[in-house]
Swiss-Prot record:
Entry's Gene Ontology BP terms: negative regulation of DNA-templated transcription
Record's function text: Negative regulator of class I heat shock genes (grpE-dnaK-dnaJ and groELS operons). Prevents heat-shock induction of these operons.
Annotated keywords: Repressor, Stress response, Transcription, Transcription regulation
HAMAP family, sorted: HrcA (MF_00081)
Originating species: Rhizobium rhizogenes (strain K84 / ATCC BAA-868)
Domain of life the protein comes from: Bacteria
Official protein name in the record: Heat-inducible transcription repressor HrcA
Record-level Gene Ontology MF annotations: DNA binding
Pfam families in the record: HrcA
InterPro entries for this protein: GAF-like_dom_sf, HrcA, HrcA_C, WH-like_DNA-bd_sf, WH_DNA-bd_sf, WHTH_transcript_rep_HrcA_IDD
Membership in a protein family: Belongs to the HrcA family.
Amino acid sequence: MGFTTSSVTDAIAALDERSKEIFRRIVEGYLENGEPLGSRNLSRLLPMSLSPASVRNVMSDLEELGLIYSPHISAGRLPTQIGLRFFVDAFMQVGDLSAEDRATIDRQVRGSNRDQPMESVMTEASRMLSGISRGAGLVITSKNDPVLKHVEFIRLEPTKALAVLVGDHDQVENRIIELPAGITSSQLTEAANFLNAHMTGQTLPDLRRQLLTLKESVRHELDTLSHELVERGIAVWSGGEDEGKPTQLIVRGHANLLTEVGGAEDLDRLRLLFDDLEKKDSLIEILNLAESGPGVRIFIGSENKLFSLSGSSLIVAPYRDDDDRIIGAVGVIGPTRLNYARIVPMVDYTAQLFSRMSRPGL
């Protein structure tokens, strides 16, 4: 039977307390052990007195709404994807992390930051998230475009120059750039002066967009060769087609996902998930998902088109630099029976920790 989203939402809102309690017990049983729950066991668990026959009637109503289903004839019930989403939105209580949990995350992640490259910090964070989640922990870092402070072109030979860019936190990037044929030293200076006049407080993508709106001004202020040099400089600094795309993904805990494999079909889904994680477009999509709303985002099964074929859930949160720009994401990928209530605050806190670590002096 097909339902529209609004009709299901209206019907769910009209559920009585008895139906909600039975539904909640079915989902909690699934999240705890992955097993279907039958009417006889449910009748023993409920705080109110209900016969197995009465429980079966309620389960039938819940099944008609699309919230639960029977995996086998005469078996108990499991939540559907719609049911899991309803549970997460309506029943799940996400509390604050305990002081002990926060201290553990600080020790494992921030502690690994002592004189360690960022890759080591990312690895430790993804390992920590994997350890608490029964899933795979992931950390993505994207290219962080610095706010520009100063630029200079230094000729190395007739056809090449060193393009030096200084960011607002005094980070320096040096790139070798091919020079337009016939360009003079004065034209190198002219191009650098133009960039310095227009770049203050902007990132390279900002400057590239601004140049599109300043075509007439550029044409009047710069000759053809200087203009070409400006465009080449921006292109080489911003990485051309890779601008703004993630540069690194760390995933730990693949073995956790193998524990959920129940047969060849599950193994095929897992292969699809691993294949998806290898694709650069997938990393971009994860970052886009993290940016699509405030705080932690939860995607269950086919709600997330990226991992819909593998039937996986994704819990993800962005982290930011000191200018509040999103520069990466942390999260967990795993089976739909993740411990959402525990994982969500941990992903949230880890993202906040990465944000603080990404800021100078913290």
